[in-house]
Amino acid sequence: DTCRRQRQMCIRDRCVKEDIIIIMQAANTGLTGGSTPYGDDYERPVIVLNTMRIDDIHIINDGKQIIGLTGSTLYNLEKKLKPYKREPHSIIGSTSIGASIIGGICNNAGGSLVQRGPSYTQMALYAKINKNGKLELVNELDINLGSSPEEILSNLQNKNYKKSDIKNTGKLGSDDKYPEIIRKINEDTPSRFNSDSRLLYGASGSAGKLAVFAVRLDTYRSPKENKVFYVGTNDPDVFWKIRRDILSKFKTLPTLGDYLHRDCYDAAKKYSKDTFLVIERLGTTFLPTLFELKRRVDILAKKLKFFPDNFSDRLMQFLSNFWPNHLPKRMENFRDLYEHHWVIEMSDEGIVEAEKYFSEIFKNQDGDYFICNEFESKKASLHRFVSASAIGRYHILNSKNHGDMMSLDIAFPRNEKNWFEKLPKEIDELLSLIHI
């Protein structure tokens, strides 16, 4: 009975004893490949553990903090926090596609978030393999849940704890240093980068090396108003100046900032169109069904030899060609006018600051801007988000003509001026699609 109630811990314990590789999987929504086995050269047997059925979210400390269990999603957290006028760490993109709370913590997600920085907490409940090779449950939630693994997991899942069991010891439930770090524009180090030791703590940044059962996180006050500024230029130095001015002079930092090169814009428009339309029109509830349909279609296509590989992707790409242009006219006009695009979201007092700044700077600098209406805001943010999947779709459709796909995630120093890389001609000519 205990093993049935604590099935996940028991499965992990058995896998450790049998020397089986465990791949933790939550929403599996990564547009560039999620938590799935890759290749056929693993040295040991592999098991994939999906956690989505354990999706409870506990609101604590009057909505200022939450406890997210292993399969809880940002989408559901956003809904639960609305009555408290609070928001989760990530509200763009990740919530749209149903990503998990814990997946973000394990990968320090939040690359475009300026005010909030990377996902981070020092409070979590997780299992690790100790120095003796045994599975060990570690409770760093700062909540009194009992002593034995069975008791801790049962009390947490059943919310069997009192307000007095919740300790407030000063441990962090978010990255409180990032706004200060990102404003230091003359430093010769990046503001954020992979495997930053500052952000590696327990579950945070663990990236699959731990089995995480729950995390305790801070929430954020919902702004009264948001506005998206769509900015374009043909001169990379203009964006360099804007970035420095905003980070060093604005009283209110942007909520987020997302860059697109014209090539990226075009690739996303063509190769991520179906993903865009599915998320926009059917929402997250249909995504699991869509993924399952794609999987079944590909299995069937493999049995029928006259169908090509990755048939579902090829079919969706073909059908998307019949759908009319899904992007707003003003975005399309900027695509024709400008090579470099920037989606900047401001909130509350920052809106007036940004409007005054942009109306002045483009009087004597190359480029222009417009303030998105609600329709354009959603389209611009979603277009940037789905662009991550475009290179994968392109590679699938053209795999016979090209070599492997290579992804580079580059963290520039904060004082870097020459941020836009111009490749040597002999290299540039060998590349079929550069996706920035």
Mark where each language-model region is:
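C-terminal substrate-recognition/cap domain of FAD-linked oxidoreductases
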Residues: 216-221, 227-434
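Glycine-/small-residue-rich beta-strand-loop submotif within the FAD-binding core of flavoenzymes
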Residues: 35-73, 112-116, 134, 217-221
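Single conserved hydrophobic/aromatic residue that forms the stacking wall/gate
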Residues: 1-7, 11, 434-435
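Short, structural beta-strand-to-alpha-helix junction motif
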Residues: 29, 65, 71-77, 100-101
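General beta-strand structural signal in soluble alpha/beta enzymes
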Residues: 4, 21-26, 33, 49-51, ...
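FAD-binding subdomain of flavoenzyme oxidoreductases
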Residues: 58, 75, 82-240
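Transmitter module of two-component histidine kinases
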Residues: 12-15, 20-24, 31-40, 45, ...
